[in-house]
Amino acid sequence: MAGNFWQSSHHQQWILDKQDLIRERQHDLKTLSEEEYQKLFMFFANIIQVLGEQLKLRQQVIATATVYFKRFYARNSLKCIDPLLLAPTCILLSSKVEEFGVISNSRLITTCQTVIKNKFSYAYQQEFPYRTNHILECEFYLLENLDCCLIVYQPYRPLLQLMQDIGQEEQLLTLTWRLINDSLRTDVSLLYPPYQIAIGCLQIACVILQKELKSWFAELNVDMDKVQEIARAIVNLFELWKGYDEKKEIQALLEKMPKPKPHPQR
């Protein structure tokens, strides 16, 4: 995973243009507002996070699964595959790619059933409807849509390198790490290289903790306009969170969301 980002498929194929991203979403944005669309993706990122934690996965594995999820819908409408099926499929694939070890299919399904029942019953009245065969079929479509570009570079490694330069700042590291996790609920992982995301999150953390590192930031060889765009996207996420009660709103959003056509009954 420590290979060259600039020569990777992540850089060459999966740093997308914002206008292309908006254009690809037009079908879904006929039904949903941009804010509703983002709220749905925040919700499914939460599902991936909780599933990953229940399965005791590293944050890197959870983050990669979330990026797979976002990449799929960057090229496809929500009606192509139910996000509730794609979320655990992304976890399964990510755990293989990140060499975490194989999650047994039965354990994955059982965890999905438990998590939906115990943690997300405010969104789903029914139990988790999918079985192993659905997830394996979905994995095939996911691989196809990702063009088998499975190596995802995350901002965590560049953050650790930046922190070595700054010096021992445990509080700053912890907060920036959390902000990187939060950034997965925005589009920044689709639009910017991971080192820029790390710097954008570090900048916000410095403001929150009132750390004076302006001269250090000024010496970085980085496009600060891009860094500001990333910081703005994360601040906008916090603004959205303030007025958003997921437990009250999500059922109506899921009802409104474009859905796959059911298979004809045989």
Swiss-Prot record:
Q: What is its main location?
A: nucleus
Q: Which GO terms describe its molecular function?
A: cyclin-dependent protein serine/threonine kinase regulator activity
Cite a GO CC annotation: nucleus
Alphabetic keyword roster: Activator, Cyclin, Nucleus, Repressor, Transcription, Transcription regulation
Every copy of the Cyclin N-terminal domain together lies at 47-151
Subcellular localization is given as: Nucleus
- InterPro entries associated with the record: Cyclin-like_dom, Cyclin-like_sf, Cyclin/Ssn8, Cyclin_C_2, Cyclin_N
**Any one Gene Ontology BP term:** positive regulation of transcription by RNA polymerase II
Subunit note? Component of the Cdk8 module of the Mediator complex.
What is the role of this chain?
Component of the Mediator complex, a coactivator involved in regulated gene transcription of nearly all RNA polymerase II-dependent genes. Mediator functions as a bridge to convey information from gene-specific regulatory proteins to the basal RNA polymerase II transcription machinery. Mediator is recruited to promoters by direct interactions with regulatory proteins and serves as a scaffold for the assembly of a functional preinitiation complex with RNA polymerase II and the general transcription factors.
Q: Give the family this protein belongs to, as stated in its UniProt record.
A: Belongs to the cyclin family. Cyclin C subfamily.
PANTHER family, per database record: CYCLIN (PTHR10026)
Q: What is this protein called?
A: Cyclin-C
